[in-house]
């Protein structure tokens, strides 16, 4: 009996020692975007609105030590759960961010605003929380509904230039999904009131263009327009 007690005590001591040596992960600088996708845009035929959340995550034992991740709206008590392998990795500046771009609520018809917590649990049970506020400028309701703004796209100057009409925006980012040579398969940003000149020779008819619209000064509100074919010119 005494031997069993001693063995149990030793095992408990070893477990506690291991747990003490495993420092909890840390979360900092959570950032979010509210992203709306028009039917026929980046997501294909399905439109909708999603909350995108990314953050700097550090664990001294590496990413493999991270267990479950939760995003919690504390005002509504609504929770999304992710596994380690669900995390996206994005580099902004000199920092590496982890997160997820498609937190969905109400069948992608709306986004919950208000107070949020990111909760990360490592594999020995350490838990860390980080809070942040999701809001839309000049919008007072607690639920932000999907409502895609009206706009028109026209082609100018023999298919060299694109113009987006009616929609107000801070900047526009352009990508050619099926022409990888353009902009090295990345998006080129055009600031508000800057002419969107895409080619000095004129784009080929039927060229497909993807538009990302940054609508707010803080970049929190983003729209992906329906992919546009150059042949669909509006006079």
Predicted ranges, named:
Residues 60-74, 162-181:
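Solvent-exposed loop/turn segments flanking beta-strands in beta-repeat/beta-sandwich domains
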Residues 21-34, 128-145:
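Proline/serine/threonine-rich low-complexity linkers at boundaries of modular beta-sandwich domains
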Residues 38-58, 150-169:
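Contiguous beta-strand segments within globular domains
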Residues 105-113, 199-208:
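Surface-exposed, short loops/turns at beta-strand junctions within beta-sandwich domains
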